Amino acid sequence: MGFHQIDERNQALLSKIALDDGHGENSPYFDGWKAYDNDPFHPENNPLGVIQMGLAENQLSFDMIVDWIRKHPEASICTPEGLERFKSIANFQDYHGLPEFRNAIANFMGKVRGGRVKFDPSRIVMGGGATGASETVIFCLADPGDAFLVPSPYYAGFDRDLKWRTRAQIIRVHCNGSNNFQVTKAALEIAYKKAQEANMKVKGVIITNPSNPLGTTYDRDTLKTLVTFVNQHDIHLICDEIYSATVFKAPTFTSIAEIVEQMEHCKKELIHILYSLSKDMGLPGFRVGIIYSYNDVVVRRARQMSSFGLVSSQTQHLLAAMLSDEDFVDKFLAENSKRVGERHARFTKELDKMGITCLNSNAGVFVWMDLRRLLKDQTFKAEMELWRVIINEVKLNVSPGSSFHVTEPGWFRVCFANMDDNTVDVALNRIHSFVENIDKKEDNTVAMPSKTRHRDNKLRLSFSFSGRRYDEGNVLNSPHTMSPHSPLVIAKN
């Protein structure tokens, strides 16, 4: 029996959650991971393999963290210098976490936001990464069948994180490219009315700020609009701020915490913040997720639920020491922002030379790339055809816009901070060759008689890579064999 097959006996024995497809494994977002898992690029061992550009990971400042750890061996209980605290740290810790860690996280969150707002350590709840923290908040706020309004495009993993086990629902707030995908009050009201017409109880709005996949930040007016909207409807606002330290140019990041403190008559108990060290520090493997809620009951219940996904005390101990080093934190935040900005500028500059534009962005570790001109027609079917060529022939794992529920075909999220400079060069060269090939085919097609043009329409999606000739019509779907390192096993943003 294959991995994806469930026989009749197991259908009777297993739960509905175990039997359904709520994980979202069949999304193109995860299909790209499967293609990478089966044929990963390596500059020497597999130079023609798939380059991972679907992983929103920040590896640009690892050297600074490694250098700090090397200089502070006492921060780890697994070194001779830190061994004296081994017993006290290795013993059972309560759900609150280590006090020094919560204090350090609160201070760090304040620094990331420019010191314009302070966070109360007693309101910090820890969870197993942003995925675990997100799900915990949904469990606290919603019953099965309740709905949340989420502006689209949104992070593809939300379909898993927010819905799968909680049985909550997502109602999309449709945003479009005509205003750079900004959220409007009108769009919120339309989505709210749609939920009411479907007899769905709306429990809140969920945003990611800075946005994944757009790489843009919400301005103050939009944040105030969101707060006013949830106050009027007496529903919750959950703000995922896990990319807040990746802002590399103006406008600066504005946290919902700042708006809450400034707005009069704000119902603070409706506001909740999700945070993590996965993106800002580049430590997704440490599985540090944070819930910061202004609601006392949510803090209490989320803390109790966190027993299902605690952060290890060893991890807390190490990070408490690191984040308490204010000189290091200041230097890290400044340098990391600089490096992300430089990589973004280099990447978008080279794309621009190829005639490829991206949404103007100021944050995140990815670009929202516009390939609409390469579609044979403006449909999501054409987007998927183009995506399969990029995955299987160009050998780049980029994520199609449809996996983020965008309303316009032809957009792709491309991550740029999870690789070294040499791999970036290889990726850019592949993109350049691909676009150049398409442009040549387009020129040839324009010169053909109309009947020939129609017959050879698929030439727009043909590509020659390393001596091999491909055509979209002959492309196989992405493989479905799951690697043990796949995000289908290890949740990743």
Curated annotation (Swiss-Prot):
PROSITE patterns: AA_TRANSFER_CLASS_1. The modification N6-(pyridoxal phosphate)lysine is found at residue 279. GO terms for molecular function: 1-aminocyclopropane-1-carboxylate synthase activity; pyridoxal phosphate binding; transaminase activity. It catalyses: S-adenosyl-L-methionine = 1-aminocyclopropane-1-carboxylate + S-methyl-5'-thioadenosine + H(+). Its cofactor is pyridoxal 5'-phosphate. Its EC number is 4.4.1.14. It is an enzyme of class 4 (lyase). Pathway: Alkene biosynthesis; ethylene biosynthesis via S-adenosyl-L-methionine; ethylene from S-adenosyl-L-methionine: step 1/2. One of its GO terms (biological process) is ethylene biosynthetic process. Catalyzes the formation of 1-aminocyclopropane-1-carboxylate, a direct precursor of ethylene in higher plants. Homodimer. Belongs to the class-I pyridoxal-phosphate-dependent aminotransferase family. This is 1-aminocyclopropane-1-carboxylate synthase 1.
